[in-house]
C-alpha cells in the first residue's frame, strides 16, 4: 500500500504526477508494518493539544513514520506554515493561533498513514466549569475518539452572554439532560441556538431505595452515599432507561454535536462518559483518568463547598476512583460482563453499538 493518498495535509493539493502543489514529491515507499498483526502505516500512540499564553502546544508520539506535519484543519497552509509546523515521529510544536472565539482544530499528518484531528479538550468557563470535549482518547485498537462530536458538562443554567455564544459556536444540535425534574425546574437549561432537548432522568424514581441516600448523608456518611448512588446508576430501572435513551440518542443519525450533562457534570455525566469510552474501546486506565478530571475542572467549587459547608461534605463535591469502582463492580455483580450490561441492561443491540463506533471513532491506522 502506498501512502500518497493517505498523506495529504489539509489545504495541500496533489497533482496527477504525485507531487504536492509546491513541487515536493509525496513519499511513495511502502508503508511500514507498525504492529504484530500486519496493520500498515503510522499510528499515533499519544497526542495532545494544550492552550498556553504563547499559543497552542501540539505534542505527539507516533510509530511507523519519520515526520509529522501539523496544520490547522480546514485551512489552506501558508508556505511559512509548511516550513515550520512539523516534527519527527515524536514532537512538539507551538502554534501562535489567535482563535478570536473560534475553537481551532489541528490536523496531524504523518508521512505515511491517516491524519489525526485534535483540539484542546478544556473549553470550560466560570459558569461552565466542567464543560469539555469527550473525545481525543486513543482506544486499545489504535483508533481515536473523535473530537468536536460529543461534549459533557455541568448544567447549562445561569449562563452569561459569552457562555451562550461559546456554546453556539460548538455546533451542538442536541442537549441530553440527565437531571431530576426538581433540578430542571429550579435551574432550567439555556440551550444553544437551534438545539433539540432530550430528558434522560437517571434518578427519576425517587422512591427507589437505591437512590434514597438522605439518611446516609444525615448520619455523616457522605462517601457511602455517593458509592450507593453509583451502584444505582448501573442497576436501578430508571437509570438503565435513562442511559439507554442517552446512547440511542447518541447513535441516531443527524449532523451536529451532542452535549450531555447533569448538575455538576461529574457523577451521572461521569458514568455516562465512562460507559461511552469503554464501549468505544478506550482502556480502563484512560477512562478513570478522564473521570477524575472533574476534580481539576471543579477545583473552585470543591474549595468553596469545603469553606461553606465544611470538609465533611467534600465527598459530595469530588469524584473518587472508588465511586467508579462501585459502578463497574455493580456491572459485574448484576450483569456479569460489560457487554451484557450494554445489551441486557441498556438494551443496546449490535447495530446501535456498531453505529456508535462508526460515528465517534476515527481510524488510527
Model regions: which residues?
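The Walker A (P-loop) glycine that initiates the GxxxxGKT/S ATP-binding motif of P-loop NTPases
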Residues: 260-262
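Ser/Thr-glycine-rich phosphate-binding loops at phosphate-binding pockets of nucleotides
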Residues: 264, 268-269
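Cys-dependent protein tyrosine phosphatase-like superfamily
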Residues: 23-258, 272-365
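Bacterial N-terminal signal peptides that target proteins for export
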Residues: 1-8, 12
